[in-house]
Amino acid sequence: MKLLIVAVGQRVPDWAQTAYDDYAKRFPPELKVELKAVKTEPRGSKTLETLYAAERERIEAAIPRGTRVVVLDERGTSLTTKALAQRLKDWQLGGDDVALVIGGPDGLEPAFRQAAHERIRLSDLTLPHAMVRVLLIEQLYRAWSVNAGHPYHRE
């Protein structure tokens, strides 16, 4: 199974990339994690609908057919660590690859959010995109460690 993190926005600070890379290399071979950064649409004088449409096109191009789509959304379901671990286990048992989508500065197109298989949120707080990448991969690693009985997560 593969976890694909699709993030709108390409540049993140070095510290965020270093932290992301550190967690990404911890995953076992049977649970591959891949990051695909997609370009943010330049604002200019474009309408929000135009920005959403351009970013949606790039996001969809980055996600292979048959992949389960999970969007990170402030209105999504809040999960505990144990609940995320169970969700990860369910995804693995389902056998499909999973794409976790992080929207750009304006979020994700409402129709794309609604069409996703699932909507989850990491926090009630508004977080910078670089931080979201790091928090997401850390929480996915933590969920894996719970399921694997690895000592990373402690009760």
From Swiss-Prot:
EC top class, as a word: transferase
Residues that bind S-adenosyl-L-methionine: L72, G103, L122, S123, D124, L125, T126, L127
Record has Lyase as a keyword: no
Highest taxon of the lineage: Bacteria
The entry's keywords: Cytoplasm, Methyltransferase, rRNA processing, S-adenosyl-L-methionine, Transferase
Cellular component annotations (GO), alphabetically ordered: cytoplasm
Catalysis: reaction(s): pseudouridine(1915) in 23S rRNA + S-adenosyl-L-methionine = N(3)-methylpseudouridine(1915) in 23S rRNA + S-adenosyl-L-homocysteine + H(+)
Pfam families reported for this sequence: SPOUT_MTase
EC number: 2.1.1.177
SUPFAM superfamilies associated with the record: alpha/beta knot
Chief place where the protein resides: cytoplasm
Transmembrane segments: none
Function: Specifically methylates the pseudouridine at position 1915 (m3Psi1915) in 23S rRNA.
Self-association state and partner proteins as the record states: Homodimer.
NCBIfam families in the record: PRK00103.1-4
Family the entry assigns: Belongs to the RNA methyltransferase RlmH family.
Protein name per UniProt: Ribosomal RNA large subunit methyltransferase H
Designated gene of the protein: rlmH
